[in-house]
Amino acid sequence: MKNILLAGAVSMIGTLVGTRWFIHWLAAKGYGQFIRDDGPTTHKTKKGTPTMGGAVIIVSVLLAYLVAHLVTWTHPSISALLVLWLFSGLGFIGFLDDWTKISKQRSLGLKPKGKLLGQAFVAITFAIGVMYFPDVHGVTPGSPAISFLRDISWLYLPVWLGIVWVILLIAGSSNAVNLTDGLDGLATGASTMVFGAYTVLSIWQFNQWCSRPTTAGNHCYAVRDPHDIAVVAIAIAGACFGFLWWNAKPAQIFLGDTGSLALGGAVAGMAVVSRTELLLVIIGALFVIETVSVMLQVSVFKITGGKRVFKMAPLHHHFELKGWAEVTVVIRFWIICGLAVSAGLGIFYAEWVAGQ
């Protein structure tokens, strides 16, 4: 438990302190956000705000994980390392995208093909990796089975199809958080709650772990490294919480694709290694809602030849154009996220109670 608390504290302090320095450095270099012309007109005032703040989150999380293990003299686990690879790998792709926007002074970053290839490489290596590296009990970080609260036995896929499923989950999750990151503090605050939920969930799995002699066979959880996954989850939650100090309206820095792609990938990674892939739809409901709003808007527009369901997508922009203040939209969306996270954890716990 010590390394869990230590990781959360170090990552939070890291972003609280590090982000301030990073803002000054970016401002001195003149590296700021470019605003798309087709966005809400109220966002024009945000032009020039420093971006790539996700870099501070990534560095703080990696540092926190390292410090937690060095201080407690414990070994890192393959499950945690794979999630951190997914987190930092997608973050690096996002960093290249942000850097291209800044250096070329345009609102569009990497070419779609290059960005997709980079994301695919990171996702594929993670998806393959989680299917290997069994522990002494034969449990691998991930599983070919689609999971809800545990692996679903009748949805056990061939390994190759399981890999495809994980890749699709990563693609959907990373882009969902990216779409949500459109208002000051929205994605950061929501991510804090989601990773906080995965911290609680992983700690519970560790306490009811099949590899513990006292819980084996008693409706336990067949996962590989739940304690270390909790270390990663709280490190990310802590980093997001600290970053929110600078990212809340009026934002002094944005996550950028560096942060949103990294956080989205890590959410998917958490779901895979904790065997809660379909539960992610509930815990991350806000991200799902935002994504569905875009899909619905585009589909209806194409089918009807120009009609729209919303004033603008993603959904948070729709409410902005209806006259809601940005802070109002963010807080109400946070409330939705909090309710969804609570519902997800409630379902997770209720299933365990029902099995006793």
Curated annotation (Swiss-Prot):
Q: Extract one GO cellular component term from the record.
A: plasma membrane
Q: Which GO terms describe its biological process?
A: cell division; cell wall organization; peptidoglycan biosynthetic process; regulation of cell shape
User: In the UniProt record, does the keyword Plastid occur?
Assistant: no
CDD domains in alphabetical order: GT_MraY
What Enzyme Commission number does this protein have? 2.7.8.13
Cysteine-cysteine disulfides: none
How the protein sits in the membrane? Multi-pass membrane protein
Q: Which cofactor does it need?
A: Mg(2+)
Q: In which pathway does it act?
A: Cell wall biogenesis; peptidoglycan biosynthesis
Q: Which UniProt keywords apply?
A: Cell cycle, Cell division, Cell membrane, Cell shape, Cell wall biogenesis/degradation, Magnesium, Membrane, Metal-binding, Peptidoglycan synthesis, Transferase, Transmembrane, Transmembrane helix
> GO molecular-function annotation terms?
metal ion binding; phospho-N-acetylmuramoyl-pentapeptide-transferase activity; UDP-N-acetylmuramoyl-L-alanyl-D-glutamyl-meso-2,6-diaminopimelyl-D-alanyl-D-alanine:undecaprenyl-phosphate transferase activity
Which reaction(s) does its UniProt entry say it catalyses?
UDP-N-acetyl-alpha-D-muramoyl-L-alanyl-gamma-D-glutamyl-meso-2,6-diaminopimeloyl-D-alanyl-D-alanine + di-trans,octa-cis-undecaprenyl phosphate = di-trans,octa-cis-undecaprenyl diphospho-N-acetyl-alpha-D-muramoyl-L-alanyl-D-glutamyl-meso-2,6-diaminopimeloyl-D-alanyl-D-alanine + UMP
Q: Which Pfam families match?
A: Glycos_transf_4 (PF00953)
**Domain of life (superkingdom):** Bacteria
Residue ranges crossing the lipid bilayer per the database entry: 4-24, 53-73, 76-96, 116-136, 152-172, 186-206, 228-248, 253-273, 278-298, 333-353
Per UniProt, subcellular location reads as: Cell membrane
Q: Which PANTHER family match?
A: PHOSPHO-N-ACETYLMURAMOYL-PENTAPEPTIDE-TRANSFERASE, PHOSPHO-N-ACETYLMURAMOYL-PENTAPEPTIDE-TRANSFERASE HOMOLOG
Q: What does this protein do?
A: Catalyzes the initial step of the lipid cycle reactions in the biosynthesis of the cell wall peptidoglycan: transfers peptidoglycan precursor phospho-MurNAc-pentapeptide from UDP-MurNAc-pentapeptide onto the lipid carrier undecaprenyl phosphate, yielding undecaprenyl-pyrophosphoryl-MurNAc-pentapeptide, known as lipid I.
* Family statement drawn from the similarity comment of this UniProt entry: Belongs to the glycosyltransferase 4 family. MraY subfamily.
- Designated name of the protein: Phospho-N-acetylmuramoyl-pentapeptide-transferase
Which organism is this entry from? Cutibacterium acnes (strain DSM 16379 / KPA171202)
